[in-house]
Amino acid sequence: MLSVFTSPSRYTQGKGATAALGREMTALGLEGPVLIIAGRTVIGLLAPAWQRSLDEAGFKHAVHRFSGECSLTEIERVKAAGRELGARTIVGAGGGKVLDTARAAAAGLGLPVVNCPTVASSDAPCSALSVIYTDEGVFQEYRFYRKNPDLVLVDTEVIAQAPPRLLVAGMGDALATWFEARTCVA
């Protein structure tokens, strides 16, 4: 029996890690322009840090506001924004649905993806799949990818500001994953 382990190409974590976004992308050989997908709250919180970090690293970038649902409509909207920008890298910043959308759009465009989670509520940041919903929020499909994200950048200072209920949700998700893994081994 073979065992297989897959993970992001690079995982970076620490207080203030958002300030290292450009440097971490450069270390992986990622290129700009960079399209960042995030919700309103996350944009308000992190846009100044993205601006400084990406400017210092020489990356042109644009921010695209997430609609709130990882749907085929939103994925196509992000892909269109990426094409219009001439994006060479897609960055998702936020919760699981934002990260799933960024991953799906990047895969559809054949681009690398960087995930910057702002909550610790699931294992979505490191995953090689997206959960797709209808525009109304009803589950539609799982979309699997050949590889995990190119970079996962976790700013623990940002994660610590998230609502406690989302951390508790992440603990539940981790526990469920443990039981799933045990079942597979048994």
Task: Identify the role of each PLM range.
Residues 108-186:
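A glycine/threonine-rich phosphate-anchoring loop and its flanking beta-alpha core
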Residues 1-3, 26, 105, 141-144:
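Short secondary-structure boundary/capping segments
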Residues 46-48, 100-103, 125-126, 163:
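Short glycine-/acidic-enriched loop or helix-start segments at secondary-structure transitions
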Residues 82-105, 109-120:
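A short, small-residue-rich loop immediately preceding and capping a beta-strand
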Residues 20-24, 49, 77, 104, ...:
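Alpha-helical scaffold segments in soluble metabolic enzymes
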Residues 42, 69-71, 97, 120, ...:
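Glycine-/small-residue-rich active-site loops that bind phosphorylated ligands and cofactors
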Residues 1-89:
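ATP/NTP phosphate-donor binding region
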Residues 14, 96, 175:
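Short, conserved catalytic/metal-binding motifs centered on acidic residues
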